[in-house]
Amino acid sequence: MTSTAAEPGSAERWGPLWGARADDWARTEDQQVPTYEEAIRRVGIEPGQRVLDVGCGSGVFLRLAADRGAKPFGVYASEALVAVARSRAPEADVRVAEMERLPYADDTFDLVTGFNSFFFAADMVAALREAGRVAKPGAPVVTQVWGRPENCTFEAMKRVVRRFMPAPPPDAPPPPELWRSARGDGGRHTSL
């Protein structure tokens, strides 16, 4: 599937869902800190590096990057969570944007991350290519997705939470599609 200007992007499709309970989502993101720390340990963040978090949520990773002296940037689908991220990491440049059409020049970032975000793209291949496009040559692109349902404790939580949330778009892709997309896009990706 290829995105066109007429098709809704990820922000338009998912922003209302994630923005509906922004403070609740923000509280749950703290559970991701061990994953974020492991990503930082593996790829490193140096002072002055430009770091982009695609799907930055409430800005926890942006805060960790800023604490290490990086210049953090983030994009997200929901204005409500962008506001939370801006308050958590005021030095970060955080904006609502489509991950399939990132508002940055080629070769801008020393590190691009996407924690549990790329599989929400309206066009995952386009989103992954965009991550590669804005990464400097040789810069890592770190992705994280949920595990296979049979190995993922998050699946149980999703079943409960699903009862209280609006339904996702009917054509939302399953997480395994991300891996097929990542293998075929020719980009530079580091997966956790």
Name each model-derived stretch.
Residues 50-54, 58-101:
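Class I SAM-dependent methyltransferase SAM/SAH-binding core
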Residues 111-125, 147:
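A short SAM/SAH-binding and catalytic strip from SAM-dependent methyltransferases
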Residues 100-111:
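A short acidic, Gly/Pro-enriched loop at the edge of an enzyme's catalytic core
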